[in-house]
Amino acid sequence: MASHASCIFCKIIKGEIPSFKLIETAKTYSFLDIQPIAEAHVLIIPKHHGAKLHNIPDDYLSDILPVVKKLTKVLKLDENNTPEGEGYNVLQNNGRIAHQVVDHVHFHLIPKKDEATGLGVGWPAEATDFDKLGKLHEKLKEELAKVDNEKL
C-alpha cells in the first residue's frame, strides 16, 4: 500500500483523521462524505495513493466496484430496479480541470432520490461528425493494439 504523508485520504486510511467508515477491505476504504451533496453520499478510495486513475494498480481498482455495489444494496438505492425509480451516480474525477479536489483517487457514490437532490449533470453533447468519429475510432484501435500486450 503506497501512501503520501500529507494526503488527507491516506491519513483517514491510517486512522490519523477520523471518518465515518462504512466498508473496509484489504485494498479499499469507504466512508461518508463530510461535505455531501445528498444524504448518504459516500466516498470509496483505494488504499494505494495515486492522484489519477491511471496511477492505481489494477488489483486495487478491481476491488472498488464490488464495494460500490455492496453499498448500493446497503443504502437501498433503487430496490425496485426500474428506470423510473430513484437512482445514484458513481463519479470519479481526474485533475483540477475535471473538478478533482483531493489528489487521491476517489469515487463518489451519490444517491439520487429525486430531481431536487443529488448530483445535477448537464451534458453538452456535440453534433456527431461520423467521418471524424470513424477516423478517431481507427486511430484508437491502432493505439489499443499497441498496448494490448503491455501492462497497463
From Swiss-Prot:
The active site is at H106. One of its GO terms (biological process) is nucleotide metabolic process. AMP binds at D33, I34, N93, H99, Q100, V101, H106, F107, H108. Its EC number is 3.-.-.-. It catalyses: adenosine 5'-phosphoramidate + H2O = AMP + NH4(+). Keywords: Hydrolase, Magnesium, Nucleotide-binding. The keyword Nucleotide-binding applies. This is Adenosine 5'-monophosphoramidase HNT1. It is an enzyme of class 3 (hydrolase). InterPro entries: HINT, Histidine_triad_CS, Histidine_triad_HIT, HIT-like, HIT-like_sf. The lineage of its organism: Eukaryota, Fungi, Dikarya, Ascomycota, Saccharomycotina. Induction: Expression is decreased at the stationary phase. Expression in suppressed in the presence of Pseudomonas aeruginosa lipopolysaccharide (LPS).
